[in-house]
Amino acid sequence: NTVSSVRFFSAYVQDQISISAHIDIIVGARYDRFEIKGVDIFDNNRAFARTDEKVSPRFGLILKPRDNISIYSSYSQSFLPRSGDQFLSLTPTTQNLAPEKFTNYEAGAKWDIRPNLNVTAALFQLDRTNATTPSPANPLVIINAGTTRTRGLELALTGKITKAWQISGGYTWQDAYIKGNDAIR
């Protein structure tokens, strides 16, 4: 349906700073710029274009009470350009919608029980703004769904059985819901 050209630029910087033998701080930022231009060949060659750019910060704190245990927390932001992660969803009707923005909070622990056996656990919350969905009134029209929130728990166990064999197991629980836009609740 469309012919598009995409230009993308990204730069990322991060530093993990040891405050003491047991405390590290992580500070980082990422800059992204997406430019997409296209023509909808089934809509009288209707042109569309969009440029999205954002600086996304990342902060973390790692506590290491013992050599084999770390407790961490992190905060990060990211975004998804309106064209989507595959650059295929931008159209003349969606080009004016704001990009999706994500804010993630996470806290967890990692424990190396033995050199060949470790356990991880994490709690997380992911808030997303400017999510989109098909309109209940007309599924061909994309509307802003508002804000979503996903909270969850992740557990993982990884171990080496032999030098050549490793086994991993994990569990994730999530609770997600839409906080905004009464039209789609």
Model-derived features: where do they sit?
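Conserved beta-strand positions that form and line the central face of beta-propeller blades
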Residues: 96, 141-144
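Short, well-ordered secondary-structure micro-motifs
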Residues: 83-84, 131-132, 179-182
